[in-house]
Amino acid sequence: MGAYDGAEAPRAAPASTAANSRPSRLLLLHSLLLRLVAVVVSILVIAVMVHAKQRVMIFKAEWDNSKAFVALVAISAICLGYSFLQFILSAFHLCSKSWKSPTKCWAWMNFIADQILTYAMLGAAAAAAELAYIAKNGSSRAQWQPICSTFNTFCTRAGASIILSFIAVLALANSSAISAYHLFRRPSSSV
């Protein structure tokens, strides 16, 4: 006869809450860093694009002459505000002694907001990239001449801002993936 004699097998002791929260805290730290990257890069996108101006004789190229560049700055400002708010909330959660995983409602709100802002930033960056492509290469069908040979400084700054905006998209997309993980993960069960 064995030690258990057909009786119910003993259950393993539940894992400590500190051990269960370690991956979540690590993900929260990654999310915090991604939000910080999104904040910094969004600031750079706005600063570089707003300074994309150049005058050549009587001609002038400015970022606010294009709706695509204005949209990029506006979406970057919204992403900046949202990412900064999420950074502050994540930092507060991380530093809190009574840290808990986010509620389902909070996880859904984060997931939806992250998705919306990621796609909005991607759309604005893509529209600005298309405009930059036309500015650099022109369009023979529309009979638009390339302007970057004349407005080199303007095109360089606009291009740098567009590259930075795609970096912001990557940070927002990764942050969105973490939000999705928090929302759709299966709770760990202790058996």
Curated annotation (Swiss-Prot):
Cytoplasmic-side positions: 1-25, 90-114, 179-191
Ranges facing Extracellular side: 47-68, 136-157
Topology with respect to the bilayer: Multi-pass membrane protein
Gene Ontology CC terms: plasma membrane
Glycosylation sites (chain numbering): 137
Domain of life where this protein originates: Eukaryota
Keywords: Cell membrane, Glycoprotein, Membrane, Transmembrane, Transmembrane helix
Subcellular locations according to the entry: Cell membrane
Membrane-crossing residue ranges in chain numbering: 26-46, 69-89, 115-135, 158-178
Keyword Cell membrane: yes
Summary of subunit composition and partner proteins: Homodimer and heterodimers.
Similarity section: Belongs to the Casparian strip membrane proteins (CASP) family.
Protein name (database record): CASP-like protein 2U3
